Swiss-Prot record:
Record-given protein name: ATP synthase subunit b, chloroplastic
InterPro entries: ATP_synth_b/b'su_bac/chlpt
Gene: atpF
Residue spans crossing the bilayer: 33-51
Sorted UniProt keywords: ATP synthesis, CF(0), Chloroplast, Hydrogen ion transport, Ion transport, Membrane, Plastid, Thylakoid, Transmembrane, Transmembrane helix, Transport
Assembly mode: F-type ATPases have 2 components, F(1) - the catalytic core - and F(0) - the membrane proton channel. F(1) has five subunits: alpha(3), beta(3), gamma(1), delta(1), epsilon(1). F(0) has four main subunits: a(1), b(1), b'(1) and c(10-14). The alpha and beta chains form an alternating ring which encloses part of the gamma chain. F(1) is attached to F(0) by a central stalk formed by the gamma and epsilon chains, while a peripheral stalk is formed by the delta, b and b' chains.
Length: 183
């Protein structure tokens, strides 16, 4: 680094002189064109390499940033496509769930209607059986009352007719009946 500074000091001394100050020398022979060309060559060679290096680094940085931006854009496009696909799948799934819910509700409705109809038919059967049972009980009670009344009337008649004349007449008719069947 010191050699570079020494070289630069020597070049400035050669080009600008010692204390004359900075100014434009219009005399071509005094300006030492060779020294100027050397200084310009050194500046261009050192500065050019540094400038070229800076420009190359900047170019590589810009290219890397562009590649990274392209990669991010591709990733964003892929994520967007995946999100759209997921949205379509979710919408399809939601539609299927709505349709399935409608179908299930209709099935439940039909099942409830059938069950209500079956319950009504069963209740109608129970009602008819109850009516038949009540009719049978009523008929049984009426029959028992008729029989009891008939027996009561027969007893009454037997008691009324149980006098001795009736017994004599029944006994005589039974004797006559058995005498016909002598063996």
């Amino acid at each position: 680094m010191e050699t570079y500074m020494d070289t630069l000091n020597q070049l400035s001394t050669i080009c600008f002189g010692h204390g004359d100050g900075f100014g434009i020398n219009t005399n071509i022979l005094e300006t030492n064109i060779i020294n100027l060309s050397v200084v310009i060559g050194v500046v261009v060679s050192f500065g050019g390499d540094a400038l070229r290096s800076l420009l190359d680094n900047r170019k590589e940085t810009i290219l890397a940033n562009l590649q990274e931006a392209d990669l991010r854009a591709k990733e964003a496009q892929e994520k967007l496509a995946a999100a759209r696909l997921q949205l379509e799948q979710a919408q399809t799934k939601a539609q299927e769930i709505r349709q399935q819910g409608t179908i299930t509700a209709e099935q439940e409705k039909q099942l409830c209607i059938k069950q209500a109809e079956a319950d009504m038919a069963r209740l109608e059967d129970v009602k008819q059986q109850t009516l038949r049972l009540q009719q049978q009980r009523a008929m049984s009670q009426v029959s028992q009352q008729v029989i009891a009344l008939a027996l009561q009337k027969v007893r009454q008649k037997l008691q009324d007719a149980a006098n001795s004349a009736f017994h004599t007449s029944v006994n005589n008719s039974n004797i006559a009946f058995f005498t016909k069947y002598k063996v």
